[in-house]
């Protein structure tokens, strides 16, 4: 009798397992398929991004070599390829190099546009702030003060990589537009700043002296010195970020 009960119980368990299998095996199969598709998709995307970065690096190197060989047409084509195929880092750097070529050809509006595109290519201030700063400098002599302030003020935060240079440029712009008091205050702060580069500190001292002595006509020389300060990245980074 006990054997009969055990046999019946075993059959019931077997039937229960069969029902569970019919219910959950299809669901489990779908989950496994989705997971597999996701893994393959990630692998494919990672391979695609790595391939793009490699092509962009090669194109960027060709552009730099063409610049060294004084072949601006070839350089422009190579940098264009790097900007189109590269990740955020290479796109930003390649656009900055194109902007530099435009400046050399005195195509200032094109240079400003390219610097703006380079600044928008990455959210990393290390990559975005230099082109944004250069675009503002190119507009110093032609744009309204409101436009210069709109471009430079975000770069003046203490946490931004070019904050001291942006503060100097903003002070120069205000001095150019007759806001002498505001400009002098900014230059004094630059003189006293702890992390201000020595050349910039010296220019701030010159500006304060010029304002105090009424010889602010020396301003163009100060502006030209400021424009020569930070340059766009030129060399290929050891490990450019995959995406920004």
Q: What residue spans do the PLM features occupy?
A:
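N-terminal positive-inside, membrane-proximal cytosolic segments immediately preceding the first
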Residues: 1-34
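Short, low-structural-confidence N-terminal segments
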Residues: 23-26, 32-46, 243-244
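Transmembrane signal-anchor/signal-peptide helices with a preference for the extracytoplasmic
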Residues: 38-60
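Flexible helix-coil transition and linker loops at the boundaries of alpha-helical arrays
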Residues: 44-48, 83-86, 120-122, 156
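Soluble extracytoplasmic domains of inner/organellar membrane proteins
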Residues: 89, 99-229, 242-244
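Long, low-complexity, intrinsically disordered segments
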Residues: 234-244
């Amino acid at each position: 009798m006990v054997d009969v009960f055990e046999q019946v119980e075993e059959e019931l368990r077997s039937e229960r397992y069969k029902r569970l299998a019919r219910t959950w095996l299809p669901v489990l199969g779908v989950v496994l398929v989705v997971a597999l598709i996701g893994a393959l998709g990630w692998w494919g995307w990672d391979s695609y991004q790595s391939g793009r970065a490699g092509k962009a690096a090669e194109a960027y190197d060709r552009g730099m070599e063409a610049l060294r060989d004084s072949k601006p047409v070839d350089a422009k084509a190579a940098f264009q390829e790097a900007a189109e195929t590269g990740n955020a880092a290479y796109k930003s750097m390649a656009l900055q190099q194109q902007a530099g070529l435009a400046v050399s050809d005195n195509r200032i509006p094109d240079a400003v546009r390219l610097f703006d595109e380079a600044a928008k290519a990455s959210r990393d201030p290390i990559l975005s702030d230099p082109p944004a700063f250069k675009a503002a400098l190119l507009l110093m002599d032609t744009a309204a003060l409101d436009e210069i302030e709109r471009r430079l003020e975000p770069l003046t935060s203490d946490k931004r990589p070019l904050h001291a240079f942006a503060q100097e440029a903003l002070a120069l712009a205000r001095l150019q537009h007759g806001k002498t008091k505001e400009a002098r205050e900014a230059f004094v702060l630059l003189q006293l700043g702890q992390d201000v580069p020595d050349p910039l500190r010296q220019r701030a001292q010159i500006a304060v002296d010029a304002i105090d002595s009424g010889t602010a006509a020396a301003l163009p020389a100060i502006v030209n010195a400021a424009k020569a300060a930070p340059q766009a990245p030129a060399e290929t980074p050891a490990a450019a970020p995959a995406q920004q």
